[in-house]
């Protein structure tokens, strides 16, 4: 299900071009936040049976991968921006406004 959401967002980014990337990313972050919730132990846990609780409700085991989940999400979102900008630059000319930000001075049209 997660991969279907990601592929649908990639298709959406490819269709709308770079002018609506912020709207699509806002939708993506809203969907991805459904998989996260804070627990009593103060760490973010996935909404899957990934943690073990003691009898008083505290987390007895919190995997260390959860600490890096926000960083992984931001890296994945940035890679979506780069990929979608490259896809839309082949199809339309409105993405030339975003491409120089990613490529530096080399991406500016002459």
Swiss-Prot record:
Keywords (A to Z) from UniProt: Membrane, Transmembrane, Transmembrane helix
Membrane-spanning intervals of the chain: 21-41, 63-83
Membrane topology: Multi-pass membrane protein
Cellular component terms per the entry's GO annotation: membrane
Cell compartment(s), UniProt: Membrane
Note: Almost completely overlaps YBL095W.
Annotated protein name in UniProt: Putative uncharacterized protein YBL094C
Species per Swiss-Prot/TrEMBL record: Saccharomyces cerevisiae (strain ATCC 204508 / S288c)
């Amino acid at each position: 299900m997660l991969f279907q959401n990601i592929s649908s967002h990639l298709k959406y980014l490819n269709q709308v071009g770079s002018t609506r990337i912020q709207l699509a990313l806002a939708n993506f972050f809203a969907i991805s936040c459904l998989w996260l919730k804070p627990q009593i132990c103060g760490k973010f846990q996935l909404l899957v049976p990934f943690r073990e609780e003691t009898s008083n409700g505290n987390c007895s085991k919190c995997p260390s991968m959860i600490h890096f989940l926000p960083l992984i999400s931001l890296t994945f979102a940035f890679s979506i921006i780069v990929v979608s900008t490259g896809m839309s630059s082949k199809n339309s000319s409105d993405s030339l406004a975003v491409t120089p930000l990613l490529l530096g001075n080399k991406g500016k049209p002459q």
